[in-house]
Amino acid sequence: MKNILITGANGQLGNEMRVLSAEHPEYTYFFTDIAELDICDEQAVLDFVKTNDIHVIVNCAAYTAVDKAEENVELCSKLNADAVGYLARAAEANQAEFIQISTDYVFDGTAHVPYKETEPTCPNSVYGRTKLAGEQHALTYCTRAMIIRTAWLYSTFGNNFVKTMIRLGKERDSLGVIFDQIGTPTYARDLARAIYAVIGQGVVPGVYHFSNEGVCSWYDFTKAIHRLAGITACQVKPLHTEEYPTPAKRPHYSVLDKSKIKMMFGIEIPYWEESLKECINALSF
C-alpha cells in the first residue's frame, strides 16, 4: 500500500484529488495545507515525509496570484521554487516519487502551434519564473520527479474564472473579455484523474503537459460558460489584451501538446466543452 502526501489540499486541484481519493481506497492519504504542514519549512517537510513513510508526493500547493506576484516576489519564490526543492529533497531521501504541478506561464506565449515539453522556456512574469525554478529544483533534487504543466485551471472549488464569469454574468448587462489570448481550459478533476493514473502506473521522470483537448480564447470560454449556465441577459464583448492591461504579462498563446502523457500513460483526455458542462452541472448557483 502506498502512502501519498498531497500538499495544497485546500486548493482547486487538492480538493479534486481528495474527492477522487474515494475511488482509490488502495492508498493511504495525507492531505495537508499550511495548518498541517508548512512546505516552506525544510526540516518540517523532511520530518513529515520520513515519519509517515511517504511513497508519493503530489505538490498541488502554489502561489497563483499572477498579478500580485509582481510585487510579492519573495513570497512567490519561496512557495513556488524553494518549497519545491524541499519537497524534492525529502522525496529523494525517502526514495519517494514526486509529482510537481507547473504551468503554461513558463513559455513566452509567442508560438502558433501547441507547445511540446522540449520547447525552450522563456517566462515573462514573476509567477512564470518562479514556477520554472520549481521545475528545475524538482528535477535536480529528485531522481523520481515528474513535472506536469497545465493551463487555465478551474473547478467547482475556490475562486476561478468559471465561477467569476457566472457571477458577473448575473450581475451585469454586458461584460468585456479578452479574445486574443488563446489556450485550453483544464478541469481540475480531469487533471486529478490523470495524476491518479500516473500514481497507479508509477512515475516516469520528466516533463509532461496536460490540459483538456481543444482550443479557445477567454472570450470563447466565457460565451460557453454563459450558454451552459443558462445566462442570456449579459452581452459578452471581445476585448484586445491592450484594452485590459495587467501587472503581469499573459501568454498570447498557451496551447499545450499532450501527446507525451497520453502515449506514456494511456490517458484519454476529454474536450474542454465536455468537461466544462460536467463542472457547471456540479455547481450550485
Place the predicted regions along the sequence by residue.
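NAD(P)-cofactor binding segment of oxidoreductase domains
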Residues: 71-99
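NAD(P)H-binding glycine-rich loop region in Rossmannoid oxidoreductase-like domains
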Residues: 42-79
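Catalytic helix-loop patch of NAD(P)-dependent Rossmann-fold dehydrogenases
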Residues: 78, 83-86, 106-148, 153
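Mid/C-terminal beta-alpha module of Rossmann-like enzyme folds, strongest
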Residues: 194, 201-247
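N-terminal Rossmann NAD(P)H-binding glycine-rich loop of SDR-like oxidoreductase domains
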Residues: 3-20
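Conserved C-terminal active-site "lid" loop/helix of NAD(P)H-dependent oxidoreductases
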Residues: 217-223, 240-279, 283-284
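NAD(P)-dependent short-chain dehydrogenase/reductase
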Residues: 136-183, 189-190, 196-197
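Rossmann-fold cofactor-recognition segment
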Residues: 30-41
